[in-house]
Amino acid sequence: MKKLALSTLLLCGLATSVLTAQQAAPVDRPAEPNLVFDDDGGKVQIVPADLSTAGPKTFHGGPLLRSAQQVSIFLGAGWGDQQFRSREASLLDVGATAGDPHVSELKKHNIRTLRAMPRLEDFSDLSRARVNDLTIQQKLSDLLRSKAIPEPDAGTVYVIFLAPGIESTLGAHRGGVDYAAYHNFVNLEAGEIHYVVVPFHEDAERHSSAATRAFAETALNPNGQGWF
């Protein structure tokens, strides 16, 4: 009888411990749709891997970009391969995509899309380790410090296209599995930097669509308090 009672107490204790651990575990993502936590705990808006939308956007009282101008950064050794490099032309100015509903939404909010700035190709080999958001921020800082890319003005959006073979992560989330693209911002010596990260996708149309949507969402929700 004593053994039965002891076993029951042990089972109850185990169940309580499991429940407590589950309750104490951090929430993997914010309550808002299409937002996740990044590597330092901030909220980041993603384009889901299936490109699904979350319904009508709601305004949260914050600023929008008055204009948006793309600066493309083709990052990774894979872009040096001609079969992939030829795709760059279709990605250089996603804000000029005719008939795209996300670009049309910018016009609805009187956000101008300016002609894209010249691209930068950086063929660094980043295939041996995961590239997280902090890696991206450090790369932007290095490129700005070396003047490899133009310093930002109020409407600059750096769009970073990752080469095939690069494994992108954002907090606990994986590029191509949990998101097709995302946008974020960071304060560096050059000022407030708005940027988009687009993991490579074999399907050129989906690749371009993800980049276009993330670019538009950057202008509509640059600091996390706009339209989303």
Identify the meaning behind each predicted range.
Residues 141-150:
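Short, well-structured alpha-helical segments in soluble
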Residues 7-17:
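Bacterial N-terminal signal peptides
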Residues 224-228:
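Post-HEXXH active-site segment of zinc metalloproteases
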